[in-house]
């Protein structure tokens, strides 16, 4: 259950529009793969979790979410294979329990028989066959959502997994009278790296396009300001315009805005000085970000 004190800003219309696009139900068809790029910490992953995934589920799809940043030290291909295995386990919970109870781990459908623990493993069942099995067994479309997909490029196995997803997409969606059985969504906080999945004839998703994820705007800050001010004394409240200006200066990053507002809210000043402090703190944090970015840039090798 959601804490009533927790601020949530739903973006259901955006979620519906993007799901329409990846389903092929929009004039802006992106059924070949939806690639969303946005700077880190701008609300992209939160949007996936609270808006886009529920939209897929409301339409009856099985959602497989893989966050390649959740464990940077693990092989990206294994994270993807593990998520697919988990989805199959959930759909086959009863059957697997019976099979393993009698010492078996193989099962199949549509002419495909495999060992669950070998999905995506060299010499084991391919991701294509595993996803095909999941669709045939459940009769439900599949939404495969890869968050921070650019990390797949860090290894050859990760790149191969991207090609496997593309092959699965082609196998499931061809000759289906426009029925999209496998919907693929890829997000990334590094647009240039994400583009390496779509630009060039040798890339896994050649021909797909990168879409800029719409950043939060004044509607978000106005709603958040109202939510925050309800919990503050009348003579110690934030000005909506000042909050948006700070938010914009911070690169439209919700968590950074909350940090700055928290510092200001606990200051001893009243509304006028508090809003001035808000601008000062946001500007200082922005300078700090730029300084860190400049230091990181100078530390890179020329090829990087």
Question: How would you label these PLM feature ranges?
Answer:
Residues 31-143, 149-153, 158:
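P-loop NTPase nucleotide-binding core
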């Amino acid at each position: 259950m959601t804490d009533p004190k927790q601020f949530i800003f739903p973006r259901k219309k955006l979620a519906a529009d993007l799901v329409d696009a990846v389903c092929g139900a929009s004039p802006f068809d992106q059924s070949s793969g939806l690639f969303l790029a946005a700077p880190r910490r701008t609300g992209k992953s939160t949007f996936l979790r609270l808006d886009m995934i529920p939209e897929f589920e409301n339409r009856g799809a099985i959602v497989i979410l893989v966050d390649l940043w959740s464990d940077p030290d693990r092989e990206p291909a294994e994270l993807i294979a593990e998520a697919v295995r988990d989805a199959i386990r959930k759909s086959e919970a009863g059957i697997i329990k019976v099979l393993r109870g009698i010492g078996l781990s193989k099962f199949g459908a549509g002419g495909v028989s495999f060992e669950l623990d070998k999905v995506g493993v060299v010499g084991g069942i391919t991701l294509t066959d595993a996803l095909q099995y999941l669709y045939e067994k459940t009769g439900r479309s599949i939404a495969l959502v890869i968050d921070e997909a650019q990390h797949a490029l860090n290894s050859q196995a990760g790149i191969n997994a991207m090609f496997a997803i593309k092959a699965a997409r082609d196998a499931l969606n061809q000759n289906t009278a426009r029925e999209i059985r496998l919907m693929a969504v890829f997000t990334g906080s590094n647009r240039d790296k994400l583009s390496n999945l779509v630009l060039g004839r040798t890339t896994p998703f050649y021909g797909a396009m990168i879409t800029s994820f719409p950043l939060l705007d004044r509607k978000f800050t106005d709603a958040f300001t109202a939510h925050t001010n309800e919990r503050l004394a009348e003579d110690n409240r934030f000005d909506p315009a000042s909050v948006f200006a700070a938010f914009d200066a911070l690169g439209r990053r919700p968590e950074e805005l909350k940090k700055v507002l928290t510092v200001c809210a606990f200051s001893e000043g009243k509304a006028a000085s508090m809003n001035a402090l808000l601008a000062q703190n946001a500007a200082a944090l922005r300078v700090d970000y730029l300084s860190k970015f400049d230091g990181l840039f100078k530390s890179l090798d020329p090829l990087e």
